[in-house]
Amino acid sequence: MACSWAIAPVCAQDISQIAKSDPLIITGSIGTNNTYFHSSAGLGYMSPLSNSFFANLNFNIYGFSMPFSIYFSNDNLNFSYPQFSFNLSPSYKNFTAHIGQSSMPFSQYVLNMSFNGVGLEWRDKQFRASAFYGVLRRAVNDNPDDPTVRIPQYRRYGWGISAGYSKGGNSIDLYFLRAYDSESSIDERWRTRVRPQENLVLGLKGQLSYKNFLSLAANVATSAFTADRESQQVMTDEARRFDKIFETRYTSRLRFAGDATLGLTLKGFNASIFYKYIQPDYVSLGTYYTSNNYHTLGLSAGTTLFRRLTLSASFSGQEDNLAKQQLYTTRGYVYNAMASLRISDRMNVTAMYNGYLQSQGDGTAQVNDTTEIHRVLHSFSLVPTYNLPGELFDHTISLSANYTENRDLNKFSVGQTDVKTLALGASYNLNVKPWETNFTFSLSHQNTKGFNSEYSSDVASISTGRSFLKEKNLSTSATVSLNYNEVRHHSKSLSMGVDLSASYTLKKYHSFSLGASFSQYGDVNLEKTRSTLDNRDVRLTFNYLYTFTLLQVSAKKKDKKEQKEKGSKGR
Protein backbone atom coordinates (compact mmCIF):
# COMPACT_ATOMS: atom_id res chain seq x y z
CA MET A 1 0.00 0.00 0.00
CA ALA A 2 1.42 3.38 -1.01
CA CYS A 3 0.67 6.46 1.04
CA SER A 4 0.95 10.10 0.03
CA TRP A 5 -0.07 13.38 1.61
CA ALA A 6 -1.37 16.56 0.05
CA ILE A 7 -2.01 20.04 1.39
CA ALA A 8 -5.45 21.61 1.41
CA PRO A 9 -5.68 25.33 2.23
CA VAL A 10 -7.71 26.76 5.08
CA CYS A 11 -9.99 29.52 3.87
CA ALA A 12 -11.37 32.45 5.83
CA GLN A 13 -14.10 34.91 5.04
CA ASP A 14 -14.08 38.66 5.57
CA ILE A 15 -13.29 39.28 9.24
CA SER A 16 -16.15 41.77 9.43
CA GLN A 17 -18.52 38.83 8.86
CA ILE A 18 -16.98 36.53 11.48
CA ALA A 19 -19.36 37.66 14.22
CA LYS A 20 -22.30 36.89 11.94
CA SER A 21 -21.01 33.45 10.97
CA ASP A 22 -22.04 30.18 12.55
CA PRO A 23 -19.69 29.28 15.42
CA LEU A 24 -19.30 25.67 14.32
CA ILE A 25 -20.43 23.59 11.36
CA ILE A 26 -19.12 20.08 10.74
CA THR A 27 -20.00 18.66 7.34
CA GLY A 28 -18.71 15.79 5.28
CA SER A 29 -19.31 13.18 2.64
CA ILE A 30 -18.64 9.49 2.09
CA GLY A 31 -18.74 7.76 -1.24
CA THR A 32 -17.51 5.05 -3.54
CA ASN A 33 -16.86 4.66 -7.27
CA ASN A 34 -16.70 1.20 -8.82
CA THR A 35 -16.09 0.10 -12.41
CA TYR A 36 -16.06 -3.35 -13.94
CA PHE A 37 -14.57 -3.72 -17.42
CA HIS A 38 -14.21 -6.70 -19.71
CA SER A 39 -12.86 -6.82 -23.25
CA SER A 40 -12.51 -9.78 -25.53
CA ALA A 41 -9.49 -8.04 -27.07
CA GLY A 42 -7.61 -8.23 -23.77
CA LEU A 43 -7.13 -6.07 -20.68
CA GLY A 44 -3.76 -4.57 -21.47
CA TYR A 45 -4.95 -0.97 -21.32
CA MET A 46 -7.42 -1.07 -18.42
CA SER A 47 -7.88 -2.88 -15.11
CA PRO A 48 -10.86 -5.29 -15.06
CA LEU A 49 -12.02 -4.00 -11.67
CA SER A 50 -11.50 -0.51 -10.30
CA ASN A 51 -12.74 0.47 -6.84
CA SER A 52 -12.32 3.68 -4.90
CA PHE A 53 -13.61 4.86 -1.55
CA PHE A 54 -13.37 8.39 -0.19
CA ALA A 55 -14.39 10.41 2.84
CA ASN A 56 -14.30 14.14 3.49
CA LEU A 57 -14.76 16.02 6.75
CA ASN A 58 -14.84 19.80 6.99
CA PHE A 59 -14.72 21.90 10.18
CA ASN A 60 -16.06 25.43 9.69
CA ILE A 61 -15.36 27.61 12.73
CA TYR A 62 -16.66 31.17 12.42
CA GLY A 63 -16.09 31.07 8.67
CA PHE A 64 -12.68 29.37 8.83
CA SER A 65 -12.79 26.17 6.79
CA MET A 66 -10.49 23.23 7.65
CA PRO A 67 -10.99 20.28 5.29
CA PHE A 68 -9.71 16.74 5.82
CA SER A 69 -10.02 13.98 3.26
CA ILE A 70 -8.94 10.39 2.68
CA TYR A 71 -9.03 8.53 -0.62
CA PHE A 72 -8.43 4.83 -1.26
CA SER A 73 -8.21 3.42 -4.78
CA ASN A 74 -7.28 -0.23 -5.29
CA ASP A 75 -3.83 -0.24 -3.64
CA ASN A 76 -3.26 3.50 -3.25
CA LEU A 77 -4.11 5.58 -0.19
CA ASN A 78 -4.11 9.38 -0.16
CA PHE A 79 -4.71 11.60 2.84
CA SER A 80 -4.96 15.38 2.79
CA TYR A 81 -4.92 17.70 5.77
CA PRO A 82 -5.33 21.47 6.10
CA GLN A 83 -2.50 23.95 6.05
CA PHE A 84 -3.22 27.11 7.99
CA SER A 85 -2.98 29.93 5.48
CA PHE A 86 -5.13 32.89 6.49
CA ASN A 87 -6.71 35.57 4.39
CA LEU A 88 -8.45 38.21 6.48
CA SER A 89 -10.04 41.26 4.87
CA PRO A 90 -11.69 43.43 7.55
CA SER A 91 -13.62 46.46 6.30
CA TYR A 92 -14.56 49.71 8.03
CA LYS A 93 -16.37 52.44 6.12
CA ASN A 94 -14.16 53.17 3.07
CA PHE A 95 -11.18 51.14 4.30
CA THR A 96 -10.36 47.48 3.63
CA ALA A 97 -7.35 45.76 5.17
CA HIS A 98 -5.72 42.60 3.83
CA ILE A 99 -3.86 40.22 6.12
CA GLY A 100 -2.24 36.97 4.98
CA GLN A 101 -2.42 35.51 1.48
CA SER A 102 -4.16 38.29 -0.41
CA SER A 103 -4.42 39.99 -3.78
CA MET A 104 -5.14 43.56 -4.82
CA PRO A 105 -6.21 45.09 -8.16
CA PHE A 106 -3.18 46.36 -10.11
CA SER A 107 -2.28 46.77 -13.77
CA GLN A 108 -1.69 43.49 -15.64
CA TYR A 109 1.78 44.75 -16.60
CA VAL A 110 2.69 45.50 -12.96
CA LEU A 111 1.18 42.93 -10.57
CA ASN A 112 -1.18 39.99 -11.16
CA MET A 113 -0.08 37.58 -8.40
CA SER A 114 -1.04 37.31 -4.76
CA PHE A 115 1.17 38.26 -1.82
CA ASN A 116 1.53 36.95 1.71
CA GLY A 117 1.64 40.02 3.92
CA VAL A 118 -0.44 43.09 4.72
CA GLY A 119 -2.31 45.58 2.57
CA LEU A 120 -4.72 48.49 2.89
CA GLU A 121 -7.28 49.88 0.43
CA TRP A 122 -9.30 53.09 0.60
CA ARG A 123 -12.16 53.87 -1.77
CA ASP A 124 -14.88 56.46 -2.07
CA LYS A 125 -17.11 57.43 -4.98
CA GLN A 126 -14.32 59.03 -7.03
CA PHE A 127 -10.93 58.55 -5.35
CA ARG A 128 -9.09 55.37 -4.40
CA ALA A 129 -5.69 54.40 -3.03
CA SER A 130 -3.96 51.22 -1.86
CA ALA A 131 -0.65 49.92 -0.51
CA PHE A 132 0.79 46.52 0.37
CA TYR A 133 3.92 44.74 1.56
CA GLY A 134 4.60 41.02 1.59
CA VAL A 135 6.22 37.92 0.12
CA LEU A 136 5.55 37.43 -3.59
CA ARG A 137 7.32 34.08 -3.89
CA ARG A 138 8.51 31.48 -1.41
CA ALA A 139 12.05 30.17 -1.46
CA VAL A 140 12.87 26.75 -2.89
CA ASN A 141 16.02 25.55 -1.17
CA ASP A 142 16.39 21.79 -1.63
CA ASN A 143 19.56 19.85 -0.89
CA PRO A 144 21.74 20.03 -4.05
CA ASP A 145 22.76 16.40 -3.51
CA ASP A 146 19.15 15.18 -3.62
CA PRO A 147 18.53 13.21 -6.85
CA THR A 148 15.01 14.71 -7.11
CA VAL A 149 16.05 18.25 -6.27
CA ARG A 150 13.78 21.06 -7.49
CA ILE A 151 14.95 24.16 -9.32
CA PRO A 152 16.03 26.64 -6.61
CA GLN A 153 14.49 30.07 -6.25
CA TYR A 154 14.95 32.99 -3.86
CA ARG A 155 12.31 34.30 -1.52
CA ARG A 156 10.91 37.39 -3.22
CA TYR A 157 9.60 40.43 -1.36
CA GLY A 158 7.54 43.24 -2.80
CA TRP A 159 5.73 46.40 -1.88
CA GLY A 160 3.53 48.63 -3.96
CA ILE A 161 1.17 51.58 -3.95
CA SER A 162 -1.60 52.76 -6.25
CA ALA A 163 -3.83 55.80 -6.53
CA GLY A 164 -6.75 56.51 -8.82
CA TYR A 165 -9.60 58.82 -9.70
CA SER A 166 -12.74 58.22 -11.75
CA LYS A 167 -15.81 60.21 -12.68
CA GLY A 168 -18.39 59.13 -15.19
CA GLY A 169 -16.65 57.33 -18.03
CA ASN A 170 -13.25 58.90 -17.29
CA SER A 171 -10.63 57.39 -14.99
CA ILE A 172 -6.92 57.39 -14.25
CA ASP A 173 -4.82 55.07 -12.05
CA LEU A 174 -1.13 55.17 -11.14
CA TYR A 175 0.75 52.04 -9.96
CA PHE A 176 4.16 51.55 -8.37
CA LEU A 177 5.87 48.24 -7.53
CA ARG A 178 9.22 47.46 -5.93
CA ALA A 179 10.26 43.77 -5.85
CA TYR A 180 13.54 42.10 -4.88
CA ASP A 181 15.01 38.70 -3.99
CA SER A 182 16.52 37.92 -0.59
CA GLU A 183 20.11 36.73 -1.16
CA SER A 184 20.24 34.74 2.09
CA SER A 185 17.06 32.76 1.41
CA ILE A 186 18.84 29.89 -0.41
CA ASP A 187 21.96 27.84 0.26
CA GLU A 188 25.32 29.30 -0.83
CA ARG A 189 25.88 26.32 -3.13
CA TRP A 190 22.95 27.48 -5.25
CA ARG A 191 23.93 31.15 -5.53
CA THR A 192 26.46 30.65 -8.31
CA ARG A 193 23.78 29.06 -10.49
CA VAL A 194 20.82 31.31 -9.63
CA ARG A 195 21.28 35.05 -9.18
CA PRO A 196 19.04 37.34 -7.07
CA GLN A 197 16.95 39.82 -9.05
CA GLU A 198 15.43 43.24 -8.48
CA ASN A 199 12.68 45.20 -10.18
CA LEU A 200 10.99 48.60 -10.16
CA VAL A 201 7.78 49.04 -12.19
CA LEU A 202 5.72 52.18 -12.81
CA GLY A 203 2.31 51.81 -14.46
CA LEU A 204 -0.40 54.15 -15.71
CA LYS A 205 -3.92 53.17 -16.71
CA GLY A 206 -6.73 55.44 -17.84
CA GLN A 207 -9.85 55.94 -19.90
CA LEU A 208 -11.50 58.94 -21.59
CA SER A 209 -15.08 59.01 -22.85
CA TYR A 210 -16.91 61.51 -25.01
CA LYS A 211 -20.72 61.61 -24.91
CA ASN A 212 -20.99 57.85 -24.39
CA PHE A 213 -20.13 57.01 -28.01
CA LEU A 214 -16.36 57.53 -28.21
CA SER A 215 -13.84 56.12 -25.74
CA LEU A 216 -10.08 55.82 -25.46
CA ALA A 217 -8.46 53.41 -22.98
CA ALA A 218 -4.74 52.97 -22.39
CA ASN A 219 -2.59 50.83 -20.11
CA VAL A 220 1.19 51.40 -20.07
CA ALA A 221 4.10 50.42 -17.82
CA THR A 222 7.85 50.95 -17.57
CA SER A 223 10.04 48.33 -15.88
CA ALA A 224 13.57 48.75 -14.55
CA PHE A 225 14.89 45.21 -14.06
CA THR A 226 18.20 43.95 -12.68
CA ALA A 227 19.12 40.36 -13.50
CA ASP A 228 21.82 40.19 -10.78
CA ARG A 229 21.57 42.31 -7.61
CA GLU A 230 25.21 41.55 -6.81
CA SER A 231 26.63 42.73 -10.14
CA GLN A 232 28.72 45.91 -10.35
CA GLN A 233 26.84 49.15 -9.83
CA VAL A 234 26.87 51.94 -12.43
CA MET A 235 28.48 54.95 -10.72
CA THR A 236 27.57 57.78 -13.10
CA ASP A 237 25.66 60.74 -11.63
CA GLU A 238 22.66 60.15 -13.87
CA ALA A 239 22.42 56.48 -12.89
CA ARG A 240 22.74 57.23 -9.14
CA ARG A 241 19.89 59.74 -9.02
CA PHE A 242 17.43 57.05 -7.90
CA ASP A 243 19.72 54.96 -5.67
CA LYS A 244 17.31 55.17 -2.75
CA ILE A 245 14.65 53.15 -4.58
CA PHE A 246 16.62 51.39 -7.35
CA GLU A 247 20.35 50.82 -7.83
CA THR A 248 21.34 50.76 -11.50
CA ARG A 249 23.81 47.96 -12.26
CA TYR A 250 25.49 46.63 -15.38
CA THR A 251 22.85 43.87 -15.54
CA SER A 252 19.98 46.38 -15.41
CA ARG A 253 17.68 47.21 -18.30
CA LEU A 254 14.71 49.52 -18.88
CA ARG A 255 11.76 48.21 -20.89
CA PHE A 256 8.27 49.38 -21.88
CA ALA A 257 4.90 47.65 -22.35
CA GLY A 258 1.49 49.03 -23.13
CA ASP A 259 -1.73 48.87 -25.09
CA ALA A 260 -4.45 51.27 -26.21
CA THR A 261 -8.01 50.83 -27.49
CA LEU A 262 -10.17 53.35 -29.32
CA GLY A 263 -13.86 52.45 -29.32
CA LEU A 264 -16.89 53.81 -31.15
CA THR A 265 -20.46 52.94 -30.14
CA LEU A 266 -23.44 54.14 -32.14
CA LYS A 267 -27.02 52.98 -32.39
CA GLY A 268 -26.84 49.58 -34.04
CA PHE A 269 -23.10 49.80 -34.73
CA ASN A 270 -19.87 49.40 -32.78
CA ALA A 271 -16.21 49.38 -33.78
CA SER A 272 -12.81 49.40 -32.08
CA ILE A 273 -9.12 49.56 -32.91
CA PHE A 274 -6.52 48.00 -30.61
CA TYR A 275 -2.74 48.23 -30.45
CA LYS A 276 -0.29 46.49 -28.09
CA TYR A 277 3.48 46.90 -27.90
CA ILE A 278 5.76 44.97 -25.53
CA GLN A 279 9.50 45.45 -25.82
CA PRO A 280 11.91 42.49 -25.84
CA ASP A 281 12.87 41.19 -22.37
CA TYR A 282 10.11 43.14 -20.60
CA VAL A 283 9.92 41.69 -17.08
CA SER A 284 7.85 42.47 -14.01
CA LEU A 285 8.61 40.41 -10.91
CA GLY A 286 5.00 40.99 -9.86
CA THR A 287 3.62 38.92 -12.74
CA TYR A 288 3.83 35.19 -13.36
CA TYR A 289 4.85 35.65 -16.99
CA THR A 290 4.46 38.33 -19.64
CA SER A 291 4.89 37.55 -23.34
CA ASN A 292 7.25 40.07 -24.89
CA ASN A 293 9.08 41.06 -28.06
CA TYR A 294 5.99 41.63 -30.22
CA HIS A 295 3.42 44.19 -31.25
CA THR A 296 -0.19 43.67 -32.33
CA LEU A 297 -2.73 45.74 -34.23
CA GLY A 298 -6.40 44.74 -34.26
CA LEU A 299 -9.70 45.96 -35.68
CA SER A 300 -13.26 44.81 -34.96
CA ALA A 301 -16.74 45.95 -35.94
CA GLY A 302 -20.32 44.79 -35.55
CA THR A 303 -23.82 45.90 -36.51
CA THR A 304 -27.45 44.80 -36.57
CA LEU A 305 -29.60 45.45 -39.64
CA PHE A 306 -33.40 45.31 -39.87
CA ARG A 307 -33.48 43.75 -36.37
CA ARG A 308 -32.87 40.39 -38.03
CA LEU A 309 -29.36 40.37 -39.44
CA THR A 310 -26.33 40.54 -37.13
CA LEU A 311 -22.90 41.09 -38.69
CA SER A 312 -19.46 41.13 -37.06
CA ALA A 313 -15.87 40.97 -38.26
CA SER A 314 -12.39 41.31 -36.79
CA PHE A 315 -8.79 41.38 -37.95
CA SER A 316 -5.50 41.36 -36.05
CA GLY A 317 -1.88 41.15 -37.07
CA GLN A 318 1.13 40.34 -34.90
CA GLU A 319 4.87 40.57 -35.51
CA ASP A 320 7.79 39.64 -33.25
CA ASN A 321 11.56 40.25 -33.38
CA LEU A 322 11.24 43.94 -32.49
CA ALA A 323 14.95 44.24 -31.72
CA LYS A 324 15.92 42.41 -34.94
CA GLN A 325 18.08 39.98 -32.93
CA GLN A 326 16.25 36.75 -33.79
CA LEU A 327 17.23 34.65 -36.77
CA TYR A 328 13.84 35.20 -38.37
CA THR A 329 10.76 37.40 -37.95
CA THR A 330 7.39 35.70 -37.58
CA ARG A 331 4.17 37.39 -38.64
CA GLY A 332 0.67 36.12 -37.98
CA TYR A 333 -2.73 37.40 -39.09
CA VAL A 334 -6.06 36.30 -37.63
CA TYR A 335 -9.34 37.30 -39.27
CA ASN A 336 -12.95 36.21 -38.95
CA ALA A 337 -16.47 37.17 -39.96
CA MET A 338 -19.91 36.13 -38.75
CA ALA A 339 -23.44 36.66 -40.04
CA SER A 340 -26.58 35.53 -38.23
CA LEU A 341 -30.01 35.88 -39.85
CA ARG A 342 -33.25 35.39 -37.94
CA ILE A 343 -35.58 34.41 -40.78
CA SER A 344 -38.53 33.96 -38.43
CA ASP A 345 -39.27 33.24 -34.80
CA ARG A 346 -38.68 29.57 -35.60
CA MET A 347 -35.73 29.61 -38.00
CA ASN A 348 -32.23 31.00 -37.70
CA VAL A 349 -29.16 30.67 -39.96
CA THR A 350 -25.58 31.43 -38.88
CA ALA A 351 -22.56 31.55 -41.18
CA MET A 352 -18.97 31.95 -39.97
CA TYR A 353 -15.52 32.26 -41.45
CA ASN A 354 -12.19 32.02 -39.60
CA GLY A 355 -8.77 32.44 -41.14
CA TYR A 356 -5.13 32.48 -40.10
CA LEU A 357 -2.06 33.36 -42.14
CA GLN A 358 1.52 32.82 -40.92
CA SER A 359 4.61 34.07 -42.71
CA GLN A 360 8.32 34.35 -42.01
CA GLY A 361 10.67 37.24 -42.75
CA ASP A 362 14.34 38.08 -42.45
CA GLY A 363 16.03 38.66 -39.11
CA THR A 364 19.73 38.32 -38.44
CA ALA A 365 19.60 35.64 -41.14
CA GLN A 366 17.97 35.71 -44.54
CA VAL A 367 14.98 33.43 -45.09
CA ASN A 368 15.68 30.42 -47.28
CA ASP A 369 12.96 29.99 -49.91
CA THR A 370 12.99 26.21 -49.58
CA THR A 371 12.43 26.21 -45.78
CA GLU A 372 10.34 29.37 -45.41
CA ILE A 373 7.30 29.06 -43.13
CA HIS A 374 4.26 30.30 -45.00
CA ARG A 375 0.89 28.73 -44.11
CA VAL A 376 -2.77 29.60 -44.36
CA LEU A 377 -5.85 28.21 -42.63
CA HIS A 378 -9.44 28.68 -43.85
CA SER A 379 -12.55 27.51 -42.01
CA PHE A 380 -16.14 27.95 -43.24
CA SER A 381 -19.22 27.02 -41.18
CA LEU A 382 -22.96 27.08 -41.82
CA VAL A 383 -25.49 26.26 -39.08
CA PRO A 384 -29.25 26.51 -39.79
CA THR A 385 -31.73 25.67 -37.00
CA TYR A 386 -35.50 25.31 -36.96
CA ASN A 387 -37.80 25.13 -33.91
CA LEU A 388 -41.44 24.08 -33.97
CA PRO A 389 -43.11 24.24 -30.55
CA GLY A 390 -46.52 22.69 -29.90
CA GLU A 391 -48.96 21.72 -27.21
CA LEU A 392 -47.95 18.05 -27.20
CA PHE A 393 -44.63 18.02 -29.05
CA ASP A 394 -41.61 20.30 -29.45
CA HIS A 395 -39.47 19.79 -32.55
CA THR A 396 -35.93 21.08 -33.13
CA ILE A 397 -33.98 20.45 -36.33
CA SER A 398 -30.35 21.49 -36.61
CA LEU A 399 -27.94 21.13 -39.52
CA SER A 400 -24.23 21.93 -39.62
CA ALA A 401 -21.53 22.03 -42.25
CA ASN A 402 -17.86 22.91 -41.84
CA TYR A 403 -14.98 22.95 -44.29
CA THR A 404 -11.40 23.51 -43.07
CA GLU A 405 -8.27 23.77 -45.18
CA ASN A 406 -4.74 23.99 -43.79
CA ARG A 407 -2.29 24.60 -46.62
CA ASP A 408 1.44 25.23 -46.99
CA LEU A 409 2.04 28.23 -49.29
CA ASN A 410 5.76 27.60 -49.72
CA LYS A 411 6.32 27.43 -53.48
CA PHE A 412 8.62 24.45 -53.03
CA SER A 413 6.08 22.54 -50.93
CA VAL A 414 4.65 19.32 -52.33
CA GLY A 415 1.71 19.28 -49.90
CA GLN A 416 3.01 16.83 -47.31
CA THR A 417 1.45 18.85 -44.46
CA ASP A 418 -1.71 20.00 -46.27
CA VAL A 419 -5.00 18.88 -44.69
CA LYS A 420 -8.60 19.31 -45.86
CA THR A 421 -11.54 18.37 -43.65
CA LEU A 422 -15.26 18.32 -44.41
CA ALA A 423 -17.69 17.77 -41.51
CA LEU A 424 -21.47 17.45 -41.90
CA GLY A 425 -24.03 16.96 -39.17
CA ALA A 426 -27.78 16.72 -38.67
CA SER A 427 -29.86 16.29 -35.54
CA TYR A 428 -33.54 16.10 -34.68
CA ASN A 429 -34.85 16.55 -31.15
CA LEU A 430 -38.38 15.55 -30.16
CA ASN A 431 -39.81 16.51 -26.78
CA VAL A 432 -42.95 14.53 -25.92
CA LYS A 433 -44.60 16.70 -23.28
CA PRO A 434 -47.22 14.21 -22.01
CA TRP A 435 -44.45 11.68 -21.39
CA GLU A 436 -41.89 14.31 -20.28
CA THR A 437 -39.41 12.48 -22.49
CA ASN A 438 -36.81 13.66 -24.99
CA PHE A 439 -35.68 11.78 -28.09
CA THR A 440 -32.63 12.82 -30.13
CA PHE A 441 -31.59 11.44 -33.51
CA SER A 442 -28.23 12.52 -34.94
CA LEU A 443 -26.06 11.81 -37.96
CA SER A 444 -22.52 13.00 -38.67
CA HIS A 445 -19.97 12.55 -41.42
CA GLN A 446 -16.34 13.62 -41.50
CA ASN A 447 -13.81 13.26 -44.28
CA THR A 448 -10.17 14.29 -43.93
CA LYS A 449 -7.69 14.28 -46.79
CA GLY A 450 -3.95 14.64 -46.35
CA PHE A 451 -0.85 13.85 -48.34
CA ASN A 452 -1.49 10.39 -49.85
CA SER A 453 -4.00 9.63 -47.08
CA GLU A 454 -7.74 9.88 -46.53
CA TYR A 455 -9.84 9.20 -43.45
CA SER A 456 -13.62 9.15 -43.12
CA SER A 457 -16.00 8.58 -40.24
CA ASP A 458 -19.79 8.17 -40.13
CA VAL A 459 -21.76 8.12 -36.88
CA ALA A 460 -25.48 7.57 -36.26
CA SER A 461 -27.06 7.64 -32.81
CA ILE A 462 -30.44 7.61 -31.06
CA SER A 463 -30.79 8.72 -27.45
CA THR A 464 -33.60 9.27 -25.00
CA GLY A 465 -33.95 10.48 -21.43
CA ARG A 466 -36.66 10.88 -18.82
CA SER A 467 -37.14 11.73 -15.14
CA PHE A 468 -39.53 9.79 -12.92
CA LEU A 469 -41.29 10.07 -9.55
CA LYS A 470 -43.02 13.09 -8.08
CA GLU A 471 -39.84 14.96 -7.20
CA LYS A 472 -38.14 13.99 -10.50
CA ASN A 473 -35.28 12.50 -8.49
CA LEU A 474 -34.96 9.40 -10.67
CA SER A 475 -33.37 10.05 -14.06
CA THR A 476 -32.69 7.54 -16.82
CA SER A 477 -31.10 7.74 -20.26
CA ALA A 478 -30.24 5.39 -23.11
CA THR A 479 -28.14 5.76 -26.26
CA VAL A 480 -27.65 3.46 -29.23
CA SER A 481 -24.89 4.33 -31.71
CA LEU A 482 -23.31 3.00 -34.88
CA ASN A 483 -19.85 4.15 -36.03
CA TYR A 484 -18.04 3.35 -39.27
CA ASN A 485 -14.39 4.42 -39.80
CA GLU A 486 -12.24 3.97 -42.86
CA VAL A 487 -8.62 4.73 -43.63
CA ARG A 488 -8.29 4.56 -47.39
CA HIS A 489 -6.21 1.59 -48.64
CA HIS A 490 -5.50 0.61 -45.05
CA SER A 491 -8.40 -0.40 -42.80
CA LYS A 492 -12.15 -0.35 -42.26
CA SER A 493 -13.81 -0.72 -38.88
CA LEU A 494 -17.35 -0.82 -37.55
CA SER A 495 -18.55 -0.43 -33.97
CA MET A 496 -22.01 -0.67 -32.40
CA GLY A 497 -22.68 0.51 -28.87
CA VAL A 498 -25.41 0.73 -26.25
CA ASP A 499 -25.15 3.01 -23.19
CA LEU A 500 -27.59 2.94 -20.27
CA SER A 501 -27.54 5.10 -17.16
CA ALA A 502 -29.73 5.80 -14.15
CA SER A 503 -29.37 8.11 -11.16
CA TYR A 504 -31.46 8.42 -8.00
CA THR A 505 -31.38 10.92 -5.15
CA LEU A 506 -32.84 9.91 -1.78
CA LYS A 507 -33.81 12.67 0.67
CA LYS A 508 -31.20 15.04 -0.87
CA TYR A 509 -28.41 13.24 1.02
CA HIS A 510 -27.97 9.92 -0.78
CA SER A 511 -27.04 9.83 -4.46
CA PHE A 512 -26.87 6.59 -6.45
CA SER A 513 -25.86 6.17 -10.08
CA LEU A 514 -25.64 3.10 -12.27
CA GLY A 515 -24.19 2.79 -15.74
CA ALA A 516 -23.79 0.04 -18.30
CA SER A 517 -22.26 0.11 -21.75
CA PHE A 518 -21.78 -2.56 -24.37
CA SER A 519 -19.92 -2.23 -27.66
CA GLN A 520 -19.12 -4.66 -30.41
CA TYR A 521 -16.49 -3.71 -32.93
CA GLY A 522 -13.87 -4.97 -35.31
CA ASP A 523 -12.31 -4.71 -38.75
CA VAL A 524 -14.68 -5.10 -41.66
CA ASN A 525 -14.10 -5.26 -45.39
CA LEU A 526 -17.13 -4.92 -47.59
CA GLU A 527 -15.31 -6.70 -50.44
CA LYS A 528 -14.95 -9.89 -48.41
CA THR A 529 -17.66 -12.36 -47.56
CA ARG A 530 -16.71 -12.49 -43.90
CA SER A 531 -15.85 -9.80 -41.40
CA THR A 532 -14.16 -9.92 -38.02
CA LEU A 533 -16.73 -7.99 -35.98
CA ASP A 534 -16.12 -10.16 -32.94
CA ASN A 535 -14.53 -7.86 -30.34
CA ARG A 536 -16.67 -6.90 -27.36
CA ASP A 537 -16.28 -4.40 -24.53
CA VAL A 538 -18.50 -4.39 -21.45
CA ARG A 539 -18.39 -1.70 -18.77
CA LEU A 540 -20.47 -1.52 -15.58
CA THR A 541 -20.31 1.34 -13.07
CA PHE A 542 -21.81 1.97 -9.65
CA ASN A 543 -21.31 5.22 -7.72
CA TYR A 544 -22.66 6.30 -4.35
CA LEU A 545 -22.36 9.56 -2.41
CA TYR A 546 -23.67 10.43 1.04
CA THR A 547 -23.43 14.02 2.28
CA PHE A 548 -24.13 14.93 5.88
CA THR A 549 -24.02 17.67 8.48
CA LEU A 550 -22.59 16.19 11.65
CA LEU A 551 -22.98 19.26 13.86
CA GLN A 552 -24.20 22.82 13.39
CA VAL A 553 -24.19 25.56 16.00
CA SER A 554 -26.15 28.38 14.41
CA ALA A 555 -25.36 32.01 15.09
CA LYS A 556 -28.99 33.00 14.56
CA LYS A 557 -30.22 30.61 17.24
CA LYS A 558 -27.59 31.95 19.60
CA ASP A 559 -28.68 35.56 18.98
CA LYS A 560 -32.33 34.69 19.58
CA LYS A 561 -31.41 32.94 22.81
CA GLU A 562 -29.46 35.97 24.02
CA GLN A 563 -32.36 38.30 23.14
CA LYS A 564 -34.76 36.03 25.01
CA GLU A 565 -32.51 36.04 28.09
CA LYS A 566 -32.18 39.83 27.96
CA GLY A 567 -35.97 40.17 27.65
CA SER A 568 -36.60 37.93 30.67
CA LYS A 569 -34.09 39.89 32.74
CA GLY A 570 -35.83 43.15 31.77
CA ARG A 571 -39.21 41.81 32.86
Language model features: what each stretch is:
Residues 71-136, 264-270, 277-280:
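Outer membrane beta-barrel
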Residues 7-12:
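Sec/Tat signal peptide C-region and signal peptidase I cleavage site
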Residues 14-41, 47-48, 59-68, 90, ...:
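Transmembrane beta-strand segments of Gram-negative outer membrane beta-barrel proteins
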Residues 104-110, 150-152, 189-197, 248-250:
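Outer-membrane beta-barrel proteins
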